[in-house]
Design a protein with these regions (language model features):
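Short, solvent-exposed micro-motifs at the edges of structured domains
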Residues: 1-292
Length: 292
């Protein structure tokens, strides 16, 4: 019998993040301005980060503040004496564009840059486990080995394909997608006794052996993401940066029942507009694995 602890920490792991995600506040301001003025061309919402907008002179009411994604100032408070031009709502949508004068803004209304993804060594992870093993060496025709692991793995990104929360990298920290909380493996070999038989009976009844491997493992975490762009970032690489709101505990259902999903999907609802939802990047856990 052996009992041991195994733990690791890793730093500077490869992870992806968006350097040029859509700015939510300018989009929210534009949409509010559209509602106030009735100017439908200023309507802004999901997947609008690469759209172009022109605010006419005097269109911003007195006291209303419009946040700008780029330019010499961070915001403009109405009333505005001159038109304001926005080509894209990302920090680097149009690097040479001055929204206050229109100078350097793409005349075709198409931003110079959309998302700019970087793969940097900024990820972290840790793993802790209790490992127990027992072995019976071959005697009296029997040999077996059993191993049990109770572990937990946490990381910021389980692979470079996992996009970090661009507003807060640490908010992406969650269960590793390959985390298997419990795993039990049992292997055995048994040689049946040799009976003192002869002829046909000897050939049929003697020389039999039985062996096998049994594996029982808890399910992997469920990767949670939202692709409706309610966070107004329009940031999609291998996955989306968006998360829904988790409004109830996750309950695993019977996936073998054709009337069931793998879990109660009603536990997740669309998050607030202009913000990433409160759900963790991964939630424990999906269906387990039984291999006999």
């Amino acid at each position: 019998l052996q009992v041991g602890y195994v733990g690791t920490q890793a730093h500077r792991l490869l992870a992806s993040h968006d350097l040029n995600y859509g700015q939510a506040q300018p989009c929210l301001d534009l949409n509010q301005l559209s509602n106030l003025t009735g100017d439908a061309s200023l309507a802004c919402g999901p997947f609008s980060a690469d759209s172009a907008y022109t605010i006419q002179p005097g269109e911003i009411p007195a006291g209303f503040t419009l946040h700008l994604p780029y330019g010499p100032v961070s915001s403009v408070t109405g009333p505005n004496a001159n038109p304001i031009t926005l080509v894209g709502l990302r920090k680097y949508s149009s690097p040479n564009c001055n929204p206050l004068t229109g100078a350097g803004c793409p005349p075709d209304g198409v931003p110079v840059f959309a998302s700019i993804f970087a793969e940097d060594t900024i990820g972290n992870s840790n793993y802790n486990s209790l490992q127990i093993s027992a072995e019976k060496r071959f005697s009296h025709g029997l040999q077996f080995q059993a191993a049990y692991t109770f572990s937990k793995s946490i990381d910021d990104a389980s692979s470079f394909e996992s996009e970090l929360n661009p507003l807060n990298f640490r908010a992406s920290r969650a269960l590793s997608l390959f985390d298997a909380r419990q795993r039990f493996v049992f292997s055995y070999f048994y040689q049946f006794p040799h009976y003192g038989l002869h002829g046909f009976a000897d050939k049929v009844l003697n020389g039999w052996q039985a062996s096998g491997i049994l594996t029982f493992q808890s399910g992997f975490p469920i990767f949670i993401t939202s692709s409706d762009d309610l966070e107004l970032m329009n940031s999609v690489f291998f996955t989306s940066a968006g998360e829904p709101d988790q409004v109830a505990p996750l309950h695993r259902l019977n996936p073998r029942n054709p009337l069931h999903e793998a879990f109660n999907i009603a536990a997740f609802q669309p998050g607030p507009v202009g913000a990433i939802g409160n759900s963790s990047r991964s939630v424990c856990c999906g269906p387990g694995i039984n291999n006999l």
